[in-house]
Amino acid sequence: MSKQLTAQAPVDPIVLGKMGSSYGIRGWLRVFSSTEDAESIFDYQPWFIQKAGQWQQVQLESWKHHNQDMIIKLKGVDDRDAANLLTNCEIVVDSSQLPQLEEGDYYWKDLMGCQVVTTEGYDLGKVVDMMETGSNDVLVIKANLKDAFGIKERLVPFLDGQVIKKVDLTTRSIEVDWDPGF
């Protein structure tokens, strides 16, 4: 299999998807995309995977839709056994490949780890995850151990201007208009 061990590992790696189970006998794999538009995962190259603690670059040879899935063919992956070795590998790219966003737009990866504080100064905790609900994104905030309200996790809608008052990526903080009791 033609995977390249690379000294040029992604500087700021970001996971864009995951390889699923093999498909057929010629080395095809199902692929699951985390990008907003599933097909956008193919716009970002090269892809990296991590096997046994080593970064490896893989080259996309082809992709296509198959029923509800997308399947991929990687260069050098020519049979089912080789494809099975890549099942569950995360597809990683360097975040420098992502397009620049307009003012007030943020990548979820940039919000992770930010401290969330109410407009009154109450520390709600840190962003540990994000959820897409259809109507708006939601911050998943892990509360501080000694939270005065006994809350372990908070879900705060990412509604710019209404709930989210200020995002400062330099200080890694988000100011929200939110009742800490929720």
Curated annotation (Swiss-Prot):
User: Which cysteine-cysteine pairs are annotated as disulfide bonds in the entry?
Assistant: none
Gene transcribed to yield this protein: rimM
Could you tell me one molecular function GO term of this UniProt entry? Answer: rRNA binding
Domain PRC barrel residue range list: 103-182
Q: Could you tell me which SUPFAM superfamilies the record lists for this protein?
A: PRC-barrel domain, Translation proteins
This one is known as: Ribosome maturation factor RimM
Q: Name one GO cellular component term.
A: cytosol
Fetch the NCBIfam families from UniProt: 16S_RimM
Q: How does it assemble?
A: Binds 30S ribosomal subunit but not 70S ribosomes. Binds ribosomal protein uS19 and probably 16S rRNA.
User: Which purpose does this protein serve, as stated in its record?
Assistant: One of at least 4 proteins (Era, RbfA, RimM and RsgA/YjeQ) that assist in the late assembly stage of the 30S ribosomal subunit. An accessory protein needed during the final step in assembly of the 30S ribosomal subunit, for assembly of the head region (the 16S rRNA 3' domain). It may act while Era is associated and before RimP in 30S subunit assembly. Essential for efficient processing of 16S rRNA; a deletion mutant accumulates 17S rRNA. Deletions do not assemble the head-associated ribosomal proteins correctly. May be needed both before and after RbfA during the maturation of 16S rRNA.
